[in-house]
Structures are given as C-alpha cells and as structure tokens.
Curated annotation (Swiss-Prot):
One of its GO terms (molecular function) is antigen binding. Residues 118-119 are annotated as: Complementarity-determining-3. GO terms for biological process: immunoglobulin mediated immune response. The gene is IGHV3-49. Keywords: Adaptive immunity, Cell membrane, Disulfide bond, Immunity, Immunoglobulin, Immunoglobulin domain, Membrane, Secreted, Signal. It comes from the Eukaryota. Residues 70-79 are annotated as: Complementarity-determining-2. This is Immunoglobulin heavy variable 3-49. It comes from Homo sapiens (Human). Residues 1-19 form the signal peptide. SUPFAM superfamilies: Immunoglobulin.
Length: 119
C-alpha cells in the first residue's frame, strides 16, 4: 500500500512539472498566396536557450508535418528545414526574450495549416 501511494505521488509531481512548460504561438492570420507572415512562439517554464525549438504544422484533414528546427546556441544555432519549405521559411530565435520565430515568405495555398512550436 505504501509503495502504491508513493508511485501516485511521484506521477503527480511529474505531471505538475510538465504543466509548467508553456509554448504560446501568435501571429497567424489570413494572407494571399505570395505574401509573408511571421509566427512567434513565446516560451516559459524552462531555460529556453538550452533547447532546440521546432515548428510543425497540420493541414486540414492531414497529419502533422515537420517544418523545421533551430538548434540551441551551444550547437551553433543552426537550422534545418523540410524540403517543402526550404528557401521560403526561416526559423530564428531570441534567447533573451525566450521567443522562437517562423518567418514564412512566398506563401502557397498548400501552406494552409495550423502551426505549432515544440521543444
């Protein structure tokens, strides 16, 4: 009985820690094809500069698609992109503000999606 209570307590602690991490996206909207849009991801609850940050998206009726990521400054702050967005999308970060950005240029109709940032 004592072991069971300890295990439940540990789960409660871990869930509480997880809930402290917040990633809030902003900047979305409707734009015409060919135009630009910049999304922001404001992070809290962890040391932002220590982590790589990724962007993924989900088009209507489809699964999640990886867009790209930016490494932490400790790993050069370099970026990688999906072939579908390479040359049009740029990911950047401002560690002093705990914000990751997704600059989207030359937008296409197929870029229509809900965009999420992930740690």
């Amino acid at each position: 009985m004592e072991f069971g209570l300890s295990w439940v307590f540990l789960v409660a602690i871990l869930k509480g820690v997880q809930c402290e991490v917040q990633l809030v996206e902003s900047g979305g909207g409707l734009v015409q094809p060919g135009r630009s849009l910049r999304l922001s991801c404001t992070a809290s609850g962890f040391t932002f500069g220590d982590y790589a940050m990724s962007w993924v998206r989900q088009a209507p009726g489809k699964g999640l698609e990886w867009v790209g990521f930016i490494r932490s400054k400790a790993y050069g702050g370099t970026t990688e992109y999906a072939a579908s967005v390479k040359g049009r999308f740029t990911i950047s970060r401002d560690d002093s503000k705990s914000i990751a950005y997704l600059q989207m240029n030359s937008l296409k109709t197929e870029d229509t999606a809900v965009y999420y940032c992930t740690r």
